[in-house]
Amino acid sequence: MQFGMPTLIENKTLNDNIALCSRLGLKFIELNMNFPEYQLDKLEETDIFIKAAEQAHIYYTIHLDENLNIADFNSLVSEAYLETVRRTIEVAKKLLPLRDKYGDQTQPLTLNMHMNHGIYITLPDRKVQMYDRDFDTYMKSFAHFRDCCEKWIGDADIKIVVENTDGFRDYEKKAIEFLLESPDFDLTWDIGHSKAIGEKDVPFIKSHVDRLIHFHIHDGSENPPKNHLALGDGEIDLNDRLQLAKSRNARCVLETKTIEALEKSVTYLKKSDGYI
């Protein structure tokens, strides 16, 4: 089990993030493609990222754009997202040697992705999700996505990991289970997200516990719903979640949103047995 940090908005540059990662004794940074400085054209300048990481003896994972929507009904949009994934996989292949040098070679390099809920139509008595209404079309998009990713990843030690956010829809669970039929896909458990929605994703996640390889670790509460808190500032049974991550040999991102909360979380782990 290794711990890393997210891309933090307070840090304006890659070097700012790396300096913080090194100071806190963390192993990796999860590069967030929602930030302008980590857009695909920037990430493709891999020599810059590799040189900076080697100087600090760290490596990277990648968080795909949260807006990623490979099932968009507009083929121009879905094809752009597919091309984004293809090129990001090529970036990850070039970053893999950093994992080999400074990480754990038993842990695949991960590209973290969210499930895009799609749009819904509000009727007088209910909301109808378009992906639920046109489920066959939705699943055809995921079949194409899975086939493409298997081809693009090839034999590289890279996994695309699906993260829980604000509650998986039933149609999303079916799509995720379809993806998990492929060895190139696994799961991320964001323990703060699940706490903030009353743990309703936990039964689904635990039914696929053998596919858990990545965790987003932060504290949270149910009432009021909060997440991305420093460890110890919420209601989560952190030891239970950390023990599961350890048993799964999972990589863990301390996904707070501020430097202060990240520092506090590292201190919390240092005081806990066997984590950092």
How should each PLM-predicted stretch be described?
Residues 1-4, 65-68, 123-125:
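N-terminal small/glycine-rich loop or linker at the start of catalytic domains
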Residues 2, 11, 15-22, 71-73, ...:
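Histidine-acidic metal/acid-base catalytic patches
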Residues 6-10, 32-36, 65-67, 116-118, ...:
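Active-site beta-loop-alpha junctions enriched in small/polar residues
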Residues 26, 58, 158, 185, ...:
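Short glycine/serine/threonine/alanine-rich loop segments
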Residues 28, 61-63, 161-163, 188, ...:
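Generic enzyme active-site microenvironment
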Residues 30-50:
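Glycine-rich, proline-tolerant flexible connector loops at the mouths of alpha/beta enzymes
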Residues 47-65, 142-152, 238-244:
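Alpha-helix-loop-beta-strand connector modules within alpha/beta enzyme cores
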Residues 54-55, 70-186:
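Active-site acidic/histidine proton-transfer and metal-coordination neighborhood
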